[in-house]
Amino acid sequence: MNKGYVLALDQGTTSSRAILFNRDGRLVGQVNHEFRQIYPQPGWVEHDPREIWSTQLRAVQDVLARTGVRLSEVAAIGITNQRETTVVWDAETGEPVYNAIVWQCRRTAPICAELAARGWAPRIREKTGLVIDAYFSGTKVKWILDNVPGVREKAEQGRLRFGTIDAWLIWNLTGGRVHATDYSNASRTMLFNIHQLAWDEEILHELGIPASLLPRALPSSHVYGETDPAVLGAAIPIAGVAGDQQAALFGQACFQPGDAKNTYGTGCFMLMNTGDRAVPSESGLLTTIAWGIGDRVEYALEGSIFIGGAAVQWLRDELRFFDRAADSEALALSVPDSGGVYVVPAFVGLGAPYWDMYARGIVVGLTRGTGRAHITRATLESIAYQTRDVLGAMEKDSGIRLNRLKVDGGAVANNFLMQFQSDILGVPVERPKIAETTALGAAYLAGLATGFWRSQAELADKWALDRGFTPALPAEERERLYAGWRRAVERARGWAAE
């Protein structure tokens, strides 16, 4: 039987997806199943791990049924996932001891504050590349051990397992035979030494997490094991695993140091490949593992922007400026410029490179002549300005000058935003033909490990341009506009600190 397909499982924050790619890297079929968001208290976010698994399994079954592709034609499975989200389960029964604590959940902020007060910030940064924050998995695991009755005792007896979502899916797909994660997901736990590629005993001891809970950390392109025929109906190698943003970097063929991509979703995630060098950030970025292939590990710098496309949703849902987010482009283009208006969408504070949780959203530069179109244009421009903030930090930390930016995510369909992004960065912006770069990255990693594709060079050749945008703004105008943005940001900072 000709194995002509790779199956990517893309387990996200709101839905579980299964996507089939053929040997050309073309999307053959996809299925998407949403699941519940659970909010037990303000600032707390959970998912039901059983629901994550059932929706993911159903997506696989449905995409095969819909495309008519048989399991015997699937060469390998790749997994990509929402990062940091934490599951602890019973090793014997496979049952979760508590709901999954989602990356957005802030309940462990007091644990983080205690850790910082004890002087751990420099050590955490040096070992893991991360800042101490409730975003990452480590304090979430500690919370489950400390707050769910009977769990700490079971953990100390070696009867429990922890994993990010990739490890939870691997465990279930293999019928409980494989407990493993990849380097990129491990690097988001705040428990993993990114230089030694090992769980850090000192941090585990400080957080009171028994080592027996932890999955084996393996390269991202690697055969983890085979699916249990009793679960899926056939034994298929699980051969590629990466966190969603790292998978998108790989799917965009950002294989060389200095290659960068920005994903425009609710927020924006920008990653720059730094090669075999884990570049420490002095500018509020995260140092993370991009992927491991064979015995080679590549690193990346990452900047997270909290509010990107969500600012456009705000204009639509709260201010009722338009009915569809896509209408923002025509409205923005109905005026020649923003009329001196700046919008700083710091609705939940500011992420990289500011990390100011007390910043709040502002609109400045209003005059009697300001209309909906000016505010809409300024809101779209704010996404591009925030990206420039992150890029400036990346270039400073890495010493690498960006020569082009690859883009993906929902908002890249907005041609006005993409052109302004190119203008304000002063570099070309490239939008690929295949929008599903995250799933494609997972498929590529799996296909490489099984010989379905021969090399990264072959994958780079498959990358195809949909549309390129080149800077059309004079340099002095670019810098004048950006200086205005920096002034606006200063006025937004620290607003809620009173």
Curated annotation (Swiss-Prot):
The keyword Transferase applies. Keywords: ATP-binding, Glycerol metabolism, Kinase, Nucleotide-binding, Transferase. It catalyses: glycerol + ATP = sn-glycerol 3-phosphate + ADP + H(+). It comes from the Bacteria. Its EC number is 2.7.1.30. GO terms for molecular function: ATP binding; glycerol kinase activity. Activated by phosphorylation and inhibited by fructose 1,6-bisphosphate (FBP). ADP binds at T13, R17, T266, G309, G410, N414. Glycerol binds at R83, E84, Y135, D244, Q245. Pfam families: FGGY_C, FGGY_N. One of its GO terms (biological process) is glycerol-3-phosphate metabolic process. Pathway: Polyol metabolism; glycerol degradation via glycerol kinase pathway; sn-glycerol 3-phosphate from glycerol: step 1/1. One of its GO terms (cellular component) is cytosol. ATP binds at T13, T14, S15, T266, G309, Q313, G410. PROSITE patterns: FGGY_KINASES_1, FGGY_KINASES_2. Sn-glycerol 3-phosphate binds at T13, R83, E84, Y135, D244. Belongs to the FGGY kinase family. Key enzyme in the regulation of glycerol uptake and metabolism. Catalyzes the phosphorylation of glycerol to yield sn-glycerol 3-phosphate. Homotetramer and homodimer (in equilibrium). This is Glycerol kinase. It comes from Symbiobacterium thermophilum (strain DSM 24528 / JCM 14929 / IAM 14863 / T).
